[in-house]
Amino acid sequence: MKLRFIECHIPKHLFMGIDEIREWDGVIWANVKTNGTISTIQILTTLKDSEKIVDKLKEMYGGANYRVVVFEPTMTYPPIEEEEEKEEPERLIREELYNIASDIANLSKENMLMLILSTIVAIAGIYKDDVALLIASMIIAPLLGPNIALSLSITVADYKLALKSIKTLIAELIFVIILSMIAGHYLPISLDNPQIHSRITLDFWSIIIALSAGIAGSLSTVSNISSIAVGVMIAIALLPPLAVFGLLIGAGYVEQSFSALILFLINMIAINLSAIVIFSAYGISPYRWWKKEEARKYTLYAILLWVTLFIAIFVLIIYH
């Protein structure tokens, strides 16, 4: 059972009492501490109940000078006995997911350095036909973050996060393509290279693999299951096909390069489509009631867009 420890810091004179909070559904333990003019409400709950408790605290104290902080306890004593009930999927709360998405969609110096290193490693792995180097570039997975963040921004109708994700994604795509084109211009690139040939040969399995890995990646994000994240990064790698696209353009193989671009688009669409569907299925939505309908509308539009693009690519592969 995954737990969360919630603290809500509020002005002392606004505190409404702890007895009502202790009666809330999902509260395992609750207490209040007062220090000067600040009262701190402390609540121990399960991960699956934490979002509704945070929302209730927002309703009670949202208009005040308050601050909610959520921790993940490493242990608690006495042990908590789990009640036998219908098992529900556990996921991170909305705010936790938002913080993760905002961080991975940030065009920071650190993220750009990781992008430079992973692109260089990917180019070297492709050129030398070295699978180990390619896997290393996939694990870094710099292009995965903005796509996940974009999908979450649509699900919660957050335009600032959407714009931030799109800007970061475009900047990273342009950088990878330009760096790969420069490398392709100076390196002796051959279409017989196994790593290049495998990324310009498309079939129906490309879509199946991309969708499967996209779903697994979305589940690992929403459930915070890090054990499958590495496998997902390798299975749905965005960087190698994009690097192959740039290398072939730089080497003058313009016509052949578009197959690698299509493979990249298949993977990117799969990530976004899977993420939106999984986020919606797990009940992730805006906190404000007036944004919920707006989020549902844009989620539907996004799903229709990604499905349409998938069908178009599928037809393109058949008649390619």
From Swiss-Prot:
Keywords: Cell membrane, Membrane, Transmembrane, Transmembrane helix. Its main location: membrane. The chain crosses the membrane at residues 107-127, 131-151, 169-189, 200-220, 228-248, 260-280, 299-319. It comes from Methanocaldococcus jannaschii (strain ATCC 43067 / DSM 2661 / JAL-1 / JCM 10045 / NBRC 100440) (Methanococcus jannaschii). It is found in: Cell membrane. The lineage of its organism: Archaea, Methanobacteriati, Methanobacteriota, Methanomada group, Methanococci. It comes from the Archaea. This is Uncharacterized protein MJ0678. It is a multi-pass membrane protein. Pfam families: DUF389. InterPro entries: DUF389. GO terms for cellular component: plasma membrane.
